[in-house]
Amino acid sequence: MSSWWQKAVVYQVYPRSFQDSNGDGIGDLKGIIQRLDYLAYLGIDAIWLSPVYKSPNDDNGYDISDYQEIMDEFGTMEDMEILIAEAMKRNIRIVMDLVVNHTSDEHPWFVEARQSRDNQYRDFYIWSDPDSQGNPPNDLGSTFSGPAWEYSELTGQYYLHLFSKKQPDLNWENQEVRQSVYDMMNFWIEKGIGGFRMDVIDLVGKQPFKKITGNGPKLHEYLQEMNRATFGNKDLMTVGETWGATPEIAKLYSKPNRNELSMVFQFEHSGLDQQPGKEKWDLIDLSIPALKDVFSKWQTELASERWNSLFWNNHDLPRIISRWGNDKEFRVQSGKMFAILLHLLKGTPYIYQGEEIGMINYPVETIEEVDDIESINMYNVRLSQGYAKEDILDSINAKGRDNARTPMQWNDSKNAGFTSNKPWLHINPNYPEINVEKALEEKDSLFYTYKKLIQLRHEHPIVVWGTYNLVDTEDENIFAYCRVLDEQKWLIITNFQEKTTTFDLKEEPKLSLIHI
């Protein structure tokens, strides 16, 4: 039996940067409500909402101090309830971001846990005595640079944080932790949400003293327990962020009879411009044959029973047109090529805000312009290691997370129609040329390509259910594939070159053209 999310297209909203309704320079829930008609016109089926919970904002909301309250800057719980209801009136479901690998260090659990070694919340987190020299128990590193252990003077122990030191990791070995998470999830399910996107969910089975972080031995046991305790018997979509997933691992998450998740985000294609064995900042040119191999592997391996997620962009990744396309003279053409290539694959496509109008990266000239904690930490570490300042900034401009987080460009008025005040993060100065209002006026704009692709998915079962076959081409810059369902066959051809080219098919196809 099929589920709604198999036919759906999901749109990610980064609330801080989407629409400000009250003039404080920060996007909010009322701003999202104001723009629901725009999203309904685009045709999307669900909104993945980046975190809106109460947070001190060390990591832009991914450090949560109260899971059942709304961040003051974003509005109130009443605003949230109105958003859920108004979206549903437009047949749009709200998918919440579930961040339960860690909390904020300002969450009441951790505030209490750090006070003493014997209080009731101590075991909600992961603590260790220093080694004989007073150092951390091992050399686990934080994703945001530096060690993953922070010393707490108050109790003389280290606590684990795989991200910022203000994001202590929860101890999922503790059944009370797990039950508290499930209770919170049910709180939101009862409010009528459409599902959860699960932040770095592959880390919750960690065994840090064995230096196991991702894909730990109890991970799937925990997810099956979560499924039973919360969403398992409900018509919800669940997608797990799993940076280290292979197709074999992804099958464990998404095979229906295992009762875990609907699908996962895998990032194999996202690492193709990274030097092997190095960090994401260490760049190499994209290999188109490698991209074809990765997409084809995932399309083939997850062809039956399991399900793919399809995406180029999110709040952590640079804008795809700047990353792998031409964001100057061929910006629109690049955007259409990436859209067509992705949206006619099998799986559930995700659009990140602004992707549908071709928003691009915002280059910075100094570190003072950067907001992202990951980029700032990397800058300081690499500067101390002797890297040239210019080279570090080049890496930030290529891969830094602020690229995706610049405010949405609605029109050519001051501050791109995002806010009447100073925006929380710089707005790309190209907004007079790249904005929603202009895209809606131009019938051949990138926006209408996305709208058409969404319509094709809704109207043609071949896009949802058809099998995938890569088409061999002598030109490595051509990515062509077929979708086949019963007697129907679609051929999709995309060209990564900045010029017109031709290639020969081995057999004459019987095709009818669809204009996108």
Spans of features found by a protein language model:
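Active-site and adjacent substrate-binding regions of carbohydrate-active enzymes
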Residues: 1-510
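Conserved small/polar residues in nucleotide/adenosyl-binding loops
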Residues: 514-516
